[in-house]
């Protein structure tokens, strides 16, 4: 469990997977160490697994929204000196990147493929129906993943909803301030 693995920390190095990090540097997409859970410790397996599965994408959405608010505050109230325009632009671009990447992560993790939160969410919400089709999903998951990566599917399944969330968070942050 995360406690025994030393993962109950905000230190990012405890969560870095070296191969995933190298892939980020090489191809722009990578991964962190997966968070292991012990379903045997759950009091209500479906309900508690659902909570765990929703927590990741929800955290991504909260981070995206807070970064959008931060961006608007910095921009609207001129919290960064206009004399250092390049520094201001860099900070705003980083903040917008945080909004974008967290929207993409939330949407991606909601895809119902084994290993992603969307798979667990569907399994927990519709256990009897899901078990009827899960064998097929497991059998063809590699083919589905390859098709997802090498075709424009990713752009539509992840890109379009991510872009909509990004714009929504920026619009809401703009309307607040």
Regions found by a protein language model. Name each.
Residues 1-177:
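Hydrophobic transmembrane alpha-helices and their immediate loop junctions
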């Amino acid at each position: 469990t995360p406690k025994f693995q030393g993962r109950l920390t905000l230190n990012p190095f405890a969560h870095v997977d070296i191969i995933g990090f190298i892939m980020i540097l090489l191809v722009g997409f990578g991964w962190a160490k997966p968070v292991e859970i012990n379903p045997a410790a759950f009091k209500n397996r479906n309900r508690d697994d659902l909570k765990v599965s929703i927590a990741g994408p929800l955290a991504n959405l909260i981070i995206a929204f807070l970064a959008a608010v931060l961006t608007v505050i910095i921009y609207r109230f001129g919290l960064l000196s206009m004399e250092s325009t390049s520094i201001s632009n860099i900070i705003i671009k980083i903040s917008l990147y945080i909004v974008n990447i967290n929207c993409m992560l939330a949407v991606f993790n909601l895809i119902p493929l084994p290993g992603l939160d969307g798979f667990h969410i569907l399994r927990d919400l519709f256990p009897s129906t899901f078990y009827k089709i899960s064998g097929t999903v497991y059998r063809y998951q590699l083919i589905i993943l390859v098709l997802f990566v090498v075709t424009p599917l990713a752009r539509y399944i992840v890109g379009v909803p991510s872009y909509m969330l990004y714009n929504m968070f920026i619009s809401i942050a703009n309307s607040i301030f």
